[in-house]
Amino acid sequence: MTQQPPDVEEDDCLSEYHHLFCPDLLQDKVAFITGGGSGIGFRIAEIFMRHGCHTVIVSRSLPRVSEAAKKLVAATGKRCLPLSMDVRVPPAVMAAVDQALKEFGKIDILINCAAGNFLCPASALSFNAFKTVVDIDTLGTFNVSRVLYEKFFRDHGGVIVNITATLSMRGQVLQLHAGAAKAAVDAMTRHLAVEWGPQNIRVNSLAPGAISGTEGLRRLGGPKASSKFKYLSSPIPRLGTKTEIAHSVLYLASPLASYVSGIVLVVDGGSWMTLPNDIGRLLEFESSSAKL
């Protein structure tokens, strides 16, 4: 098998790419990707486009997604529509979906990748900080899924992939807010898979582990996060890459997974089973007076 080239830490397209799947796996499909202007969402958009898909990438920052769209189109030759949208505001979601449908005439795939996170012990977590994460992660996922269902998926079918996390699987310290929000999304995945399956809609979650070159790793692991996690105490002792996550999402969104619905696909090298909780870091946080 051809060796995959190293990933790119920054939000840039890969300098070279060797297809592991058929290049036309998503030929002429249209994917709506929240959080598509950076990190994992950006790489998902790139990998989808390298497999024949057109994309709509959305973020609150129009300059960010506009710049990302230019890079994606230049690297892949596929169409990419950048839109500004706040997943927490249903009217904004409706307007963005309407604009995407006007541009492409359809949406085949929804990737819910928008998220918010930070480190904080539960004892210092403000009511507003907790609500903000739930609003983005949980309510945002519902808002976009519900709007797309009403405007297209109910009558035409579709695929939804929710990007979640492994935090709730082992009670990760300093992550109550994100763990609870993402666990709710995993529950939503199962409920929607059951309720919307008869309309030919598949719904799955993908839970990444520690992934290099992402804002999440930088924010949660600090400025030296990549070197800090170089030798993880996990079955596959290294950080994952954005490309590896994107390939897994590609599988779930493609006809290869045509009979897969309602699952949480964990892509973390097995680290959720072996990576220890950092109780010492929890104590450091709790000894400070800072509250979020």
From Swiss-Prot:
GO biological process: fatty acid catabolic process; fatty acid metabolic process; unsaturated fatty acid biosynthetic process
Domain of life: Eukaryota
Binding site for NADP(+): 35-40, 60-64, 86, 182, 208-214
Motif Microbody targeting signal per UniProt: ranges: 290-292
Binding site for substrate: R60, R88, F118, S126, F127, N128, R219
Keyword annotations of the record: Acetylation, Fatty acid metabolism, Lipid metabolism, NADP, Oxidoreductase, Peroxisome, Phosphoprotein
N6-acetyllysine carried by residues: K151, K291
Assigned EC number: 1.3.1.124
Reaction(s) the record says it catalyses: a (2E,4Z)-dienoyl-CoA + NADPH + H(+) = a 4,5-saturated-(3E)-enoyl-CoA + NADP(+); a (2E,4E)-dienoyl-CoA + NADPH + H(+) = a 4,5-saturated-(3E)-enoyl-CoA + NADP(+); (2E,4E)-hexadienoyl-CoA + NADPH + H(+) = (3E)-hexenoyl-CoA + NADP(+); (2E,4E)-decadienoyl-CoA + NADPH + H(+) = (3E)-decenoyl-CoA + NADP(+)
Assigned protein family: Belongs to the short-chain dehydrogenases/reductases (SDR) family. 2,4-dienoyl-CoA reductase subfamily.
PANTHER family tied to this protein: PEROXISOMAL 2,4-DIENOYL-COA REDUCTASE, PEROXISOMAL 2,4-DIENOYL-COA REDUCTASE [(3E)-ENOYL-COA-PRODUCING]
Protein name: Peroxisomal 2,4-dienoyl-CoA reductase [(3E)-enoyl-CoA-producing]
Organism: Rattus norvegicus
Annotated gene: Decr2
